[in-house]
Regions:
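Non-heme di-metal
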Residues: 1-279
Length: 279
């Protein structure tokens, strides 16, 4: 078994070994998934603005941590996008991202309210832990599935960052002075956040990343169609261990035992669902 390198925080684009790129090892479905992921990651500034509204008045350190998180997320999108541009010269990150931003902006990004749409700062951090659980497992799966050396490196670097981001939000969650939420309330927040991604974010990012502007008239956006295509492209990289790690991280954020019956049951159900979705 090959042991993945350990990547430290603070890398930049020049640290990636771009010269090792091997076009013969680019897998089309994985390329399509990476293009879509690049757009989602590149959209971090809007999330930063929203989170800074939610945590207004919480201190300089919190604001600085959110800004650093946003810079790292944006760099993830830039690295994935550059790799995709090398693998497919027809892909242009900035153009695809402009289309994505024009058609996808969650309502709470532009709302004037300062509170969280999750009802509290604790709820917001649970939602963020859910996202970071998903991204850390996803990029770990891409790292393990890819034979292309540069993508393997990029995915490994991003996965390491996402685990650190999970810890940031988990620690922020537990630092809040607000009353704790009940388990079922936390679970509803987690499920709602997953459904938000299932609605349009993943499907529309896949569409904008993989359908060229000149192809739009013949291929109009259909959420169900492109959600299915996005699922086929991305879900095939997972092994059961990636899903179980994801579930354990979510369960931990909910305040339950990450190695208990709930984690085992949820892991089995999620694996079954994803296996069916990628079939």
């Amino acid at each position: 078994m090959t042991v993945a390198p350990v990547y430290k925080q603070g890398w930049d684009m020049d640290d990636i070994h771009w010269s090792l790129f091997d076009p013969a090892k680019v897998e089309p479905a994985l390329l399509a998934a990476v293009k879509a992921a690049a757009l989602v990651e590149y959209n971090a500034p809007d999330y930063v603005t929203y989170l800074k509204r939610v945590f207004a008045g919480s201190g300089i350190e919190t604001m600085a941590a959110l800004e650093q998180w946003g810079r790292e997320e944006t760099q993830h999108g830039r690295a994935l996008g550059r790799w995709a541009e090398i693998a497919d010269p027809k892909f242009n990150l900035e153009q695809a991202f402009a289309r994505f931003r024009k058609g996808y902006t969650p309502a709470h990004f532009t709302a004037s309210e300062t509170g969280s749409v999750r009802g509290s700062r604790r709820g917001e951090m649970i939602a963020r832990c859910v996202v970071e659980s998903g991204t850390s497992s996803y990029y770990s799966a891409i790292r393990d599935a890819s034979d292309e050396p540069v993508l393997t490196e990029i995915a490994g670097r991003i996965a390491a960052d996402e685990y650190r981001h999970y810890k940031l939000f988990y620690d922020t969650l537990n630092a809040q002075s607000e009353p704790d939420l009940g388990l079922w309330k936390k679970l509803r927040i987690a499920v709602r956040r997953v459904r938000e991604s299932d609605d349009d974010e993943l499907a529309y990012s896949y569409y904008c990343a993989n359908v060229l502007p000149e192809e739009e008239p013949a291929n109009p956006y259909n959420r169900r169609k492109y959600s299915r295509l996005a699922g086929h492209a991305s879900m095939g990289v997972y092994h059961r261990r990636h899903i179980q790690k994801l579930v354990q991280m979510v369960i931990k954020a909910l305040g339950a035992n990450p190695h208990g019956w709930l984690a085992n049951l949820a892991g089995a159900l999620l694996w079954r669902r994803l296996s069916a979705k990628s079939a």
